[in-house]
Amino acid sequence: MDETGKDATRLPVGTDRYVLGTAVQTKIAGKPVEGPVYEFAPVINTFLREHLFGDIFGRDVLDFQDRELATAAALASLPAETQLRSHLKGCLNVGLSSQHLKEFVTVLETKVGKSEAQMAARLLDDILQQ
């Protein structure tokens, strides 16, 4: 049986979740996030910033590196290529090395599947060549 981890520390009273979420989202993306989907439905980005990046990423249960790596693994297993590309870039933006991500691809092959690992390797190679 897995050990239960610690509870998340609550955000300080008065924390502006939108401001916090915007800062977290920008750090992971490496730049401010914008684009047609957010212009078409701006509330989507508000929900992402306040809830996902503010409420969840802003807590201290997982650091950004672990959270991005877990997200990349989930996306590779779906497979969700466009989102995986974005989160592999996010892994680099939060400090994971290219070597760490190459090892991640090796783990994907043994734990998830060969085709998923090949997709991740192709995306990673493309990202690293940019």
What kind of region is each of these model predictions?
Residues 78-84, 113-114:
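Short loop/beta submotifs within extracellular cysteine-rich repeat domains
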